[in-house]
From Swiss-Prot:
Reactions that this protein is recorded to catalyse: (6S)-5,6,7,8-tetrahydrofolate + NADP(+) = 7,8-dihydrofolate + NADPH + H(+); dUMP + (6R)-5,10-methylene-5,6,7,8-tetrahydrofolate = 7,8-dihydrofolate + dTMP
Assembly information from the UniProt record: Homodimer.
Known role: Bifunctional enzyme. Involved in de novo dTMP biosynthesis. Key enzyme in folate metabolism. Catalyzes an essential reaction for de novo glycine and purine synthesis, DNA precursor synthesis, and for the conversion of dUMP to dTMP.
GO CC terms: cytosol; mitochondrion
Protein name, UniProt field: Bifunctional dihydrofolate reductase-thymidylate synthase
Family annotation (HAMAP family): Thymidy_synth_bact (MF_00008)
Active site: 469
Length: 587
């Protein structure tokens, strides 16, 4: 037997609170805890703006592209039952149904509970289920024609309307007896259910949901409004898509990879996005017109888009701040990226990166060096601006020789806790060799949860030319594979982060090889993520470039000691990239 809720896309939407005194009777909460929907003919709670906004968004939203699929499905039903030419337009149907809208169905009491200024619910076809209410009652109530309202006497009267009306979805919006009849007759496809997390006096309850038939399939964020928290859940009566079903070529079957997901999962995602802060969305709207190509890419699944999406989010929604350098930034706090090192080497392709410089700097760290001249002799200028006389003097390091960068990354990796004098001193066997220790743990105690390398030495911060940006990494071994997670406190999206992604990925490959493991995953956690003002225009260019497939990285398999690697032991294969983009470093 056909499921009419599926054919005609009939949903329920309701908000339920906890019932006062129920908490005292039972201390074991479950999905039935939230069941109160009315008291003395009105809502048990005072106006909740968040729930009202959600209700309006869900019941007003339409998707013209998805409607093609819905209409095709309904037409097939009509043809199958020889109804296509037999259904006449009901005289009660409003003329405005040529405009695609949703239908909302409610009982008489629910209609009467709506404030007059909101009647009828705008941009929706209002259907009232009542044996006693008459059309003239509605006209007289608001002194207008209320053409957007239809009165039916029974649930069965709804289906002739659904069969001959252009509509997107049909929502049952109350009250209790109406919900119950539709549920009892298996006429509800999904329930959009608001959980108002407070207790109120209630004399009307939502009917019990058959949890063998309906399962919770989506849960929203948690919100606060009118002195209570609330969230939104979706109960779904899931229907697997029949792979043999005839489907028109131009219809959309859903955004999820699993083929058994219904097409309207996309709508559910949109519903849950109802409360995006409009001011935030338009925060930096002066940049919005610059991302035509970026915005034309519908599914941004290439892993490089993790990085590009962060930049886009910061440029469009970031907070404008002054900063230490005087350049100024747009910034946001807290992101994460994951890269599968078993499949590719995440060397960004939307601009050409200086891979030799990345590797030389990493080898310099591994050797525990602090002498910037070593890098300059190799024409690697990453640290040049931080080693000048002016920069060191600004850090009150007047005694420090030019390009003596102090106890920075490599020194902390190899000599943590040792007393630093200058870049010429010999620190062999001084301090804690963290790098040696983590390699030993990976080899001999791989399940240890203390495989941590830390560059943030509070005692030494004032002695460093620049306190570390990427401050801590941890390693994880499972099934012969090594993963690394790195936390970065200060994240220069334009210049620094692309290098950091590549550097710690290479570092993971190197440690994996010397420990006889395979590289698995690099996870990058970003704290203060920022775009410098003088990088914005360059990054707009980068965002409008389409990523290429990532390259692969090959290491000399004969190297078994981390200190024995040289630049010639690294081969990047098939690095396809866009042109270099110049950006000035803010020092």
């Amino acid at each position: 037997m056909e499921d009419l809720s599926e054919t005609f896309d009939i949903y329920a939407i309701c908000a339920c609170c906890k019932v006062l005194n129920d908490d005292e009777k039972v201390r074991c909460f479950n999905n039935k805890t939230f069941k109160g929907i009315g008291n003395a003919g009105v809502l048990p709670w005072k106006c909740n703006l968040i729930d009202m906004k959600y209700f309006s968004s869900v019941t007003s939203y339409i998707n013209e592209n998805n409607y093609i699929r819905l209409k095709w499905k309904r037409d097939k039903y009509m043809e199958k039952h020889n109804l296509k030419n037999n259904v006449e337009l009901n005289t009660n149907i409003i003329s405005s149904t040529n405009n695609l809208q949703n239908i909302v169905v409610m009982g008489k009491k629910s209609w009467e509970s709506i404030p007059k200024k909101f009647k009828p619910l705008q941009n929706r076809i209002n259907i009232i289920l009542s044996r006693t209410l008459k059309k003239e009652d509605i006209v007289n109530e608001n002194n207008n024609e209320n053409n957007n309202v239809i009165i039916i006497k029974s649930v069965d009267d709804l289906f002739p309307i659904l069969k001959c009306t252009k509509y997107y979805k049909c929502f049952i919006i109350g009250g209790s007896s109406v919900y119950k009849e539709f549920l009892d007759r298996n006429l509800i496809k999904k329930i959009y259910f608001t959980r108002i997390n407070n207790s109120y006096n209630c004399d009307v309850l939502f009917p019990e949901i058959n949890e063998n038939l309906f399962k919770i399939t989506s849960i929203s964020d948690v919100y606060y409004s009118n002195n209570t928290t609330l969230d939104f859940i979706i109960y779904s009566k899931t229907k697997e898509i029949n792979p043999n079903e005839e489907v028109p070529n131009n219809t959309f079957l859903g955004v999820c990879d699993e083929q058994n997901k219904a097409f309207d999962d996309e709508d559910d995602y949109t519903y849950f996005s109802f409360n995006k802060n409009k001011e935030n969305i338009k925060k930096n709207s002066e940049h919005a017109h610059n991302f035509k190509i970026y915005n034309s890419i519908k599914y941004k699944n290439h892993p490089e888009y993790q990085y590009l999406n962060i930049i886009y989010d910061i440029i469009m929604h970031g907070n404008k701040q002054d900063d230490r350098t005087g350049v100024g930034v747009l910034s946001k706090f807290g992101y994460m990226m994951k890269f599968n090192l078993n499949e590719y080497f995440p060397l960004l392709t939307t601009k050409k990166l200086f891979i030799r410089g990345i590797i030389e700097e990493l080898l310099w760290f591994i050797r525990g060096e602090t002498n910037g001249n070593t890098l300059l002799e190799k024409n690697v200028r990453i640290w040049e601006a931080n080693g000048t006389r002016e920069f060191l003097d600004n850090r009150k390091l007047f005694h420090r020789e030019v390009n003596d960068l102090g106890p920075i990354y490599g020194f902390q990796w190899r000599h943590f806790g040792a007393e630093y004098t200058d870049m010429h001193d010999n620190y062999k066997d001084k301090g804690v060799d963290q790098l040696k220790n983590i390699i030993n743990l990976i080899k001999n105690d791989p399940t240890c949860r203390r495989i941590i390398l830390c560059a943030w030495n509070v005692k030494n911060l004032d002695q460093m030319a620049l306190p570390p940006c990427h401050i801590l990494c941890q390693f994880y071994v499972f099934d012969g594979k090594l993963s690394c997670i790195m936390y970065q406190r200060s994240c220069d999206l334009g210049l620094g982060v692309p290098f950091n992604i590549a550097s710690y990925s290479i570092f993971t490959y190197m440690i994996a090889q010397v420990c006889n493991l395979q590289a698995a995953e690099f996870i990058h956690v970003l704290g203060n993520a920022h775009v410098y003002n003088n990088h914005i225009e360059s990054l707009k260019i980068q965002l409008n470039r389409t990523p290429y497939p990532f390259p692969t990285l090959k290491l000399n398999p004969d190297i078994k000691n981390i200190e024995d690697f040289t630049i010639s032991d690294f081969t990047v294969q098939n690095y396809v990239h866009h042109d270099k983009i110049n950006m000035d470093m803010a020092a």
